[in-house]
Amino acid sequence: MNCTKGGGFPLLFCAVICLMAQQGACNVVLIANNTTLSFDDVEATFTPEVKDSGVNGAIYAVEPLDACSPLRKKAANGPVSPFALVIRGGCQFDDKVRNAQNAGFKAVIVYDDEDSGVLVSMAGSSSGIYIYAVFLSKASGEVLKKYSGQSDVEVWILPVYENSAWSIMAISFTSLLAMAAVLATCFFVRRHQIRRDRGRIPVTREFHGMSSQLVKAMPSLIFTKVQEDNSTSSSCAICLEDYSFGEKLRVLPCRHKFHATCVDMWLTSWKTFCPVCKRDASAGTSKPPASESTPLLSSVIHLSAESTALSSFRSTVAVSPPRPIRRHPSSQSTSRAYSISSAPRNYNLQRYYTNSPYISTSRSNVDLANMSSQWSHTPHQASMHSLRSGHLSLPINIRYTIPHVSRSDYGSASLGLSHDSCSHHGSPSYYHSSLGQQRSYLMHRTESGPSLSTMVLQSPQ
């Protein structure tokens, strides 16, 4: 049943109303001596409508009674219009009316040949027909037939407007009920089809967010005042509203803060990462969050700088040839290494990184040559002799730690690399400083053992 194709229903509805309105449009009234009879009739659809004042005449039964052939008797001319009484059957309604019209009758009354009690609306071709025609029941036709040919009997065909109005109202109400029933049927059928189709298609739900239990487990706080300097410390990045005193804030693993209601809706309904830094909110806090003070690429740059500085230092020590170094007259063999233990630890390392080669903060073994074995077996005088003659061939195994700053007796800052030694003889240390011109310092052995301690300044040539 296709309910969408109902374009012809309004036309059919109007046609039914017109036909049913004409069914109660007229009444046949018989007036005889002290007798008045009224019969219900239905007007034909192919003949002219009865005038408002109605028409009257005398009734005559024709021969043949079915009027399917030309009538044997013509209508008599007189002051009263002749009406032909015809029985149903044998031919079409328009043929009966046309034969009666040709015989001179002014109206045709057709009665049913069966006692069905149903009045029909006669249909046919209206070509060349200008007289009136109505349809009666079989009982009404038998009564009229008794008064056929009597000149003192008068028959009226009158329109009945009251019956027509009530019929239109009844038909309209019935038609509206039928239309409502059809529409309701279509609605329920369509609804049933949609439910059936939904049952056939597998339901696939796409999960976008986190579970509410996991979101509620994240830490939260009550806002009192701005305590940090970042993009989410004073306002919510989701609703763009400033925090108010007493509001509940949710803290994500990346340390960004939001309104609890805003970020809970974001994490459970949309995405599982931070709206600011795009970090997964379900992951743990293994590293500090990226902010203005800790850029995203800081760790990468730090690691690459360490590896570059270490490789550069190794290549420099291995390739550079020995240089002659003269001992400064003011330095003594009994001098001690400059103390660097009192240097502050919170020194700004950025200045050192930009002005001097970077040395890895991790412990590294730098092999300068096989220096330790010769250094331990060679006397102090031989060591100084080799240093004066320009041969720095004694190898040292040094472990470097984080560089720090000390102040020498000359007033200039020196950057030192301390050495962690496992032997009881001490540890060699290497120091470097700048006094405005090319200088180099030599750390050489003291009484404490095989360590380079005294810094010897080479005079410029």
From Swiss-Prot:
InterPro entries: E3_ligase_sorting_rcpt, PA_dom_sf, PA_domain, Znf_RING, Znf_RING/FYVE/PHD, ZNRF4/RNF13/RNF167_PA. The keyword Lyase does not apply. GO terms for cellular component: cytoplasm; endomembrane system; protein storage vacuole membrane. Glycans are attached at residue 34. Residues 319-339 are annotated as: Disordered. SMART domains: RING (SM00184). Residues 1-26 form the signal peptide. Residues 67-147 form the PA domain. GO terms for biological process: protein transport; ubiquitin-dependent protein catabolic process. It is found in: Prevacuolar compartment membrane; Protein storage vacuole membrane. The chain crosses the membrane at residues 168-188. It is a single-pass type I membrane protein. GO terms for molecular function: ubiquitin protein ligase activity; zinc ion binding. Involved in the trafficking of vacuolar proteins. May function as a sorting receptor for protein trafficking to the protein storage vacuole (PSV). This is Receptor homology region, transmembrane domain- and RING domain-containing protein 2. It comes from Oryza sativa subsp. japonica (Rice). The gene is RMR1.
